[in-house]
């Protein structure tokens, strides 16, 4: 617009400055005869007298033609001038536009250079932080190596002190042996000198007795030394035999040269008789004590049972507790301790982490350590009622009587007359409608099969005198089974345990004599439906094909049937759960690294098979993982909480709390990755014997998650339903604390952005050192656990990826 206005002003100026043909004073005349150049204009001023003449001339035709030519000339000049002005204005516009573009490009280039400098500074800061982190890690590794070397030196010094003590004890034992031999030799010489010829025989017997006593003392000392060092014991035996032979030959070289061999034989025979006599007296004292507490018929049957059981082979794997008890009573205390120690060592030597630890062999089923059960969570989810949880703590109800000798429970043989037990709850005799001969025969066959009895808790002593054929359950819906009872085609062998949903017993198939485990579901409609759902899932898992060289590592269901309004599921037998294995062989110290590797590979194979079956287990924990007798194969059991992926419900109480994934607590959509999280928690517990996330509440669990794994992503928190229970509107974690004074729960902001705890320090404390090869494997285990416990379920490792992890490869 500015340019157009300038052009119009120029046009107006030109029009005002150009002469017109109507101007009477100025006339352009072209005179070719004059000396002026072409294009010059003469201005002629006419007088008033000549105006008339000129006006008359203008009226003539020739004058009109000259005026028209002059007008066309002026018009052409004006057109040229306008074109030039228009062209110059357009060129100036292009020049301005081009200058403006150049300035814009310069500004853009300057911004680009500024951004490049900013990126360069940012990269420099990042490199500086990375170098600082590397230096910090290097210092941490250096400190860890220094601590490891210090621990190794301390262990080496401890071993040297132990060797020093052992050598001093060996020297003391040798000196005591030599002193006893000298005293023995002098005493035997003096006794022979003072003996008369008629008391020769008595004197020889006395020397035999003296030598027997010294031999027993030496044998006892040798037993003590054997526990400390077997090699030194063998040397002591050799020296003792040489000294004894030389001294015997010296003492009797003049009279009886063959007597030393006779003395040794008589010593061994006397020692055997003494041990038998002590055992007989011990049994007699026990029987006298037992006779005071029990009626005479029970005593006679017990003694008969003991005589039968004393002839059985105690090394058999199927030997029940009663047989073991009588064999224990028939041994001396020192021999008993040695035998138990050797048997335990032969079983657990490959699975202990520390064979010299006293805690590794401590095991008590009644130990009330802190554990996590899903029963309270089932109550919160509405699956079970309050009285169902209380019913779990009640003892298993059977009609088997027991007695206790030296804190060992022994099943008594069946008696012709009913015996009243100490418990007040009356229980019927479910075999009362059968002939007594058949009942006695079945019990007799069971005793012969079981070796005379089974281990039964003393709390299950009941009164079998009640006869109610229409009532098979107790008040809580548990089936009141009886040892020896035949259910369908299976004969009950012994009780195993009871839970909220069922009672578990061991049994044998009557035709094939095959060992099985029967799960007897409680007589409740909801639990019956859960049992049917478990059967359906087990059938689906068993029908899913596996790889040719792999196993499913899931418990196999053999049969199922209904018996007296109870759904019964038959499984293959296994030894114990991994929870019991850790309590027995690795309490507070865990299992060996190789055992954890073997178990981890089998667990991921099981997860892979379960995922291929489109099933979520939703309750993986050491209690639901069983191991075989050889302790080299594990299987996942208890699919009562399992289901298909489309059946999953958003609830914060799914899975046992210590093994519960964060997406369950936050109310986020979950899938098969919750089982991977549970397996990661189990692996840490296998190696340490302790819980990785021992939270008391869901809020406490989230705090532990963030301390070990860092903060949650805001994207995940925004998609969760229960995020308001644990985070504020700014997505800051709110820690729940209990006010001890007001007894109220208050929420305190507890912002955690980075991990404050390390899983490697949880696996290996600072005061523990392991070999370098095991350290490499332990770092791989830590990496596998971290990938299994990633907070985001979409980034968590899958079972197939875990099977290719470095930790699962052999050493």
UniProtKB/Swiss-Prot annotation:
<feature type="binding site">
    <location>
        <begin position="496"/>
        <end position="504"/>
    </location>
    <ligand>
        <name>ATP</name>
    </ligand>
</feature>
<feature type="binding site">
    <location>
        <position position="519"/>
    </location>
    <ligand>
        <name>ATP</name>
    </ligand>
</feature>
<keyword id="KW-0067">ATP-binding</keyword>
<keyword id="KW-0995">Kinetochore</keyword>
<feature type="active site" description="Proton acceptor">
    <location>
        <position position="619"/>
    </location>
</feature>
<feature type="region of interest" description="Disordered">
    <location>
        <begin position="288"/>
        <end position="341"/>
    </location>
</feature>
<dbReference type="GO" id="GO:0000387">
    <property type="term" value="P:spliceosomal snRNP assembly"/>
</dbReference>
<dbReference type="GO" id="GO:0000244">
    <property type="term" value="P:spliceosomal tri-snRNP complex assembly"/>
</dbReference>
<dbReference type="GO" id="GO:0016607">
    <property type="term" value="C:nuclear speck"/>
</dbReference>
<dbReference type="InterPro" id="IPR050494">
    <property type="entry name" value="Ser_Thr_dual-spec_kinase"/>
</dbReference>
<feature type="compositionally biased region" description="Polar residues">
    <location>
        <begin position="203"/>
        <end position="215"/>
    </location>
</feature>
<dbReference type="GO" id="GO:0045292">
    <property type="term" value="P:mRNA cis splicing, via spliceosome"/>
</dbReference>
<keyword id="KW-0547">Nucleotide-binding</keyword>
<feature type="compositionally biased region" description="Basic and acidic residues">
    <location>
        <begin position="217"/>
        <end position="240"/>
    </location>
</feature>
<keyword id="KW-0158">Chromosome</keyword>
<feature type="region of interest" description="Disordered">
    <location>
        <begin position="1"/>
        <end position="257"/>
    </location>
</feature>
<dbReference type="InterPro" id="IPR000719">
    <property type="entry name" value="Prot_kinase_dom"/>
</dbReference>
<dbReference type="GO" id="GO:0005524">
    <property type="term" value="F:ATP binding"/>
</dbReference>
<feature type="domain" description="Protein kinase">
    <location>
        <begin position="490"/>
        <end position="808"/>
    </location>
</feature>
<comment type="similarity">
    <text>Belongs to the protein kinase superfamily. CMGC Ser/Thr protein kinase family.</text>
</comment>
<feature type="compositionally biased region" description="Polar residues">
    <location>
        <begin position="293"/>
        <end position="302"/>
    </location>
</feature>
<comment type="function">
    <text>Serine/threonine kinase involved in spliceosomal assembly as well as mitosis and signaling regulation.</text>
</comment>
<feature type="region of interest" description="Disordered">
    <location>
        <begin position="353"/>
        <end position="379"/>
    </location>
</feature>
<feature type="compositionally biased region" description="Basic and acidic residues">
    <location>
        <begin position="81"/>
        <end position="202"/>
    </location>
</feature>
<keyword id="KW-0808">Transferase</keyword>
<feature type="region of interest" description="Disordered">
    <location>
        <begin position="408"/>
        <end position="452"/>
    </location>
</feature>
<dbReference type="InterPro" id="IPR044092">
    <property type="entry name" value="STKc_PRP4"/>
</dbReference>
<dbReference type="GO" id="GO:0106310">
    <property type="term" value="F:protein serine kinase activity"/>
</dbReference>
<keyword id="KW-0539">Nucleus</keyword>
<dbReference type="GO" id="GO:0004674">
    <property type="term" value="F:protein serine/threonine kinase activity"/>
</dbReference>
<feature type="compositionally biased region" description="Low complexity">
    <location>
        <begin position="46"/>
        <end position="71"/>
    </location>
</feature>
<dbReference type="GO" id="GO:0090266">
    <property type="term" value="P:regulation of mitotic cell cycle spindle assembly checkpoint"/>
</dbReference>
<keyword id="KW-0418">Kinase</keyword>
<feature type="compositionally biased region" description="Low complexity">
    <location>
        <begin position="310"/>
        <end position="327"/>
    </location>
</feature>
<keyword id="KW-0723">Serine/threonine-protein kinase</keyword>
<dbReference type="InterPro" id="IPR017441">
    <property type="entry name" value="Protein_kinase_ATP_BS"/>
</dbReference>
<keyword id="KW-0137">Centromere</keyword>
<dbReference type="InterPro" id="IPR008271">
    <property type="entry name" value="Ser/Thr_kinase_AS"/>
</dbReference>
<feature type="compositionally biased region" description="Polar residues">
    <location>
        <begin position="241"/>
        <end position="257"/>
    </location>
</feature>
<dbReference type="Pfam" id="PF00069">
    <property type="entry name" value="Pkinase"/>
</dbReference>
<dbReference type="GO" id="GO:0000776">
    <property type="term" value="C:kinetochore"/>
</dbReference>
<dbReference type="InterPro" id="IPR011009">
    <property type="entry name" value="Kinase-like_dom_sf"/>
</dbReference>
């Amino acid at each position: 617009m500015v340019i157009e206005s300038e052009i119009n002003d120029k046009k107006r100026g030109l029009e005002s400055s150009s002469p017109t043909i109507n101007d009477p004073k100025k006339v352009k005349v072209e005179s070719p005869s004059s000396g002026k150049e072409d294009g010059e204009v003469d201005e002629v001023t006419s007088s008033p007298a000549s105006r008339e003449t000129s006006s008359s001339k203008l009226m003539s035709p020739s004058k009109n033609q000259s005026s028209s030519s002059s007008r066309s000339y002026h018009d052409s000049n004006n057109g040229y001038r306008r074109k030039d002005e228009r062209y110059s204005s357009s060129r100036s516009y292009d020049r301005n536009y081009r200058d403006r573009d150049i300035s814009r490009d310069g500004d853009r280039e300057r911004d680009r250079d500024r951004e490049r400098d900013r990126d360069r500074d940012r990269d420099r800061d990042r490199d500086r932080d990375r170098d600082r982190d590397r230096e910090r890690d290097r210092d941490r590794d250096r400190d860890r190596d220094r601590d490891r070397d210090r621990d190794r030196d301390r262990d080496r010094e401890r071993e040297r002190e132990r060797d020093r003590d052992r050598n001093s004890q060996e020297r003391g034992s040798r000196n005591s042996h030599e002193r006893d031999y000298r005293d023995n030799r002098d005493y035997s010489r003096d006794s022979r000198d003072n003996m008369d010829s008629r008391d020769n025989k008595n004197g020889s017997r006395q020397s035999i007795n003296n030598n027997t006593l010294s031999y027993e003392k030496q044998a006892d000392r040798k037993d003590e030394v054997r526990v400390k060092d077997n090699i030194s014991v063998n040397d002591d035996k050799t020296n003792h035999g040489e000294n004894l032979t030389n001294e015997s030959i010296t003492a009797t070289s003049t009279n009886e040269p063959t007597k030393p061999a006779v003395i040794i034989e008589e010593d061994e025979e006397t020692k055997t008789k003494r041990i038998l006599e002590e055992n007989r007296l011990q049994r007699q004292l026990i029987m006298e004590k037992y006779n005071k507490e029990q009626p005479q018929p029970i005593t006679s049957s017990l003694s008969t049972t003991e005589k039968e059981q004393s002839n059985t082979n105690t090394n058999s794997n199927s030997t029940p507790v009663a047989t073991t008890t009588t064999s224990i009573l028939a041994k001396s205390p020192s021999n008993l301790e040695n035998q138990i120690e050797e048997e335990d060592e032969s079983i657990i030597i490959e699975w202990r982490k520390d064979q010299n630890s006293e805690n590794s062999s401590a095991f008590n089923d009644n130990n009330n350590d802190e554990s996590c059960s899903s029963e309270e969570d089932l109550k919160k989810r509405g699956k079970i009622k309050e009285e169902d949880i209380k019913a779990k703590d009640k003892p298993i109800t059977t009609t088997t009587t027991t007695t206790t000798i030296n804190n060992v429970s022994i099943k008594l043989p069946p008696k012709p007359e009913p015996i009243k037990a100490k418990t007040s709850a009356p229980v019927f005799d479910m075999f009362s409608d059968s002939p007594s001969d058949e009942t006695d025969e079945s019990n007799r066959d069971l005793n012969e099969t079981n070796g005379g009895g089974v281990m039964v808790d003393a709390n299950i002593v009941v009164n079998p005198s009640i006869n109610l054929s229409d009532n098979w359950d107790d008040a809580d819906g548990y089936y009141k089974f009886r040892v020896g009872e035949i259910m369908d085609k299976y004969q009950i062998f012994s009780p195993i345990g009871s839970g909220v949903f069922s009672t578990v017993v061991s049994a044998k198939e009557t035709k094939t004599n095959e060992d099985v485990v029967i799960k007897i579901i409680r007589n409740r409609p909801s639990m019956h439906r859960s049992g049917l759902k478990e059967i359906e899932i087990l059938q689906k898992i068993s029908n899913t094909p596996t790889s040719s060289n792999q196993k499913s590592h899931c418990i196999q269901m053999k049969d199922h049937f209904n018996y007296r309004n109870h759904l019964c599921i038959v499984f293959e037998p296994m030894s114990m759960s991994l929870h019991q294995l850790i309590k027995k062989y690795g309490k507070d110290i865990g299992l060996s690294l190789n055992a954890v590797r073997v178990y981890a590979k089998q667990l991921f194979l099981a997860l892979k098979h379960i995922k291929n079956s489109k099933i979520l287990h939703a309750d993986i924990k050491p209690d639901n993982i069983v191991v075989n007798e050889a302790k080299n194969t594990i299987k996942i059991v208890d699919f009562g909480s399992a289901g298909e992926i489309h059946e999953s419900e958003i609830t914060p109480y799914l899975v046992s709390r210590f093994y519960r994934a964060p997406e369950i607590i936050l109310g986020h959509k979950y899938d098969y990755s919750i089982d991977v999280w549970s397996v990661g928690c189990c692996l840490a517990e296998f190696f340490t014997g302790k819980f990785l996330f021992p939270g008391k509440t869901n809020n406490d669990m989230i705090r532990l998650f963030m301390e070990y794994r860092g903060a949650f992503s805001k994207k995940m928190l925004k998609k969760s339903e229960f995020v308001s229970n644990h985070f504020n509107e700014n997505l800051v974690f709110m820690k729940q604390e209990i006010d001890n004074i007001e007894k109220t729960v208050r929420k305190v902001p507890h912002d955690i952005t980075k991990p404050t705890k390390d899983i490697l320090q949880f696996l290996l404390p600072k005061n523990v050192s392991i070999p370098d090869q095991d350290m490499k494997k332990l770092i791989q285990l830590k990496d596998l656990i971290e990938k299994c416990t990633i907070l985001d379920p979409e980034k968590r490792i899958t079972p197939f990826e875990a099977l290719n992890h470095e930790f699962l490869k052999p050493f």
